[in-house]
From Swiss-Prot:
Pathway: Glycan biosynthesis; glycogen biosynthesis. GO terms for cellular component: cytosol. Keywords: Glycogen biosynthesis, Glycosyltransferase, Transferase. GO terms for molecular function: alpha-1,4-glucan glucosyltransferase (ADP-glucose donor) activity; alpha-1,4-glucan glucosyltransferase (UDP-glucose donor) activity. This is Glycogen synthase. The keyword Heme does not apply. The gene is glgA. Transmembrane segments: none annotated. Belongs to the glycosyltransferase 1 family. Bacterial/plant glycogen synthase subfamily.
Amino acid sequence: MQVLHVCSEMFPLLKTGGLADVIGALPAAQIADGVDVRVLLPGFPDIRRGIPDAHVVSRRDTFAGKISLLFGHYNGVGIYLIDAPHLYERPGSPYHDTNLYAYIDNVLRFALLGWVGCEMACGLDPFWRPDVVHAHDWHAGLAPAYLAARGRPAKSVFTVHNLAYQGMFYAKHMDDIELPWSFFNMHGLEFNGQLSFLKAGLYYADHITAVSPTYAREITEPQFAYGMEGLLRQRHLEGRLSGILNGVDEKIWNPESDLLLASRYTRDTLEEKAENKRQLQIAMGLKVNDKVPLFAVVSRLTNQKGLDLVLEALPGLLEQGGQLALLGAGDPVLQEGFLAAAAEHPGQAGVQIGYHEAFSHRIMGGADVILVPSRFEPCGLTQLYGLKYGTLPLVRRTGGLADTVSDSSLENLADGIASGFVFEDSNAWSLLRAIRRAFVLWSRPSLWRFVQRQAMAMDFSWQVAAKSYRELYYRLK
């Protein structure tokens, strides 16, 4: 079984979000599971620099100009790169310029990604041809459409990492991307009078996956589907929509071997975690005190992530004696709110605006509770890192958060399945009730340690996801 992942970024070569983490870990796990997997990426400068052995496999004159297909390796995974400097070698992010304006030719830049994915199934590399083209998010959404236009030379899977991003372009661009105009209708890639790369992936793929079982159910409902609920409900009824939970890259996120921690530990040596807490308290300007629970946030500061709820609930958390360590950036109003709270409560609240991968490890290793109160969360990785590090997640019951964290209720404690704290409603009162439950459990150190060990014993490795994807591919074949 030969599988080609088509996507726009890959950790650690290039990362703007969680998609990169998935592509940075899933292919290697699939190779270990016996699947012949390769990855197709645009030739962005950071990616090119990370694959110095890339050599030319093929050259083509395309609707987006002359390109070369390169092939190399990264960490044992075969990587195809689309070498098109006129499209991909630019300042700014992969998607927008330094002024945060989307590149005006994004329609060509990412249509080309889907087109090359299809051409791989038609023999663009004469020595390797995929049985399954696995496209990720809107950037690769046209790959299933091109495959459909070419008579489906390979099966296709489309994974939704976040349905909110839809890749919308003017209808006139149908003339530019070499897809038939017959595809531009409601039973195709048209959405609200425009061309939607996301809808193309959803409509033409042989199977759709979401990044958690709960999110796969949620996106069939209007409040989560951004207008796509009709199509997704139909795919669900046809058995062509499922959820496969993302995993944790244990080579990077593992408290037993994490060199970014002051003190490494396992579920059997949790007492070693205390030194990480002490160092984190010092780094964040908090009072060094191992008797109070240290709550943490590592997140984009947005309402979607529920950080407005944290800001509203923060006085109640601090009044109970807790501490807060926050690392993140985003909404200026939220940034200012948290900075003001830290200034008002020195020694109790510490805030760092920005994102630093290394410091996020130190927070995960040192905190007692990680807050993930998202309004929606397709999968979420932060809570998985918390479970792995014995930093109990406090989450809202949505998407992947609902699939991965079990509340420390009396019943769950008795059944040995408690792993954190879960609340239902998107309001500060509901969040504060969950925070109160965390304080109650904290007052019972032996129970707290029991839940930590339960959390750390859970298996959210990529090997589990790789097995599920392999079974899906073989069902399609």
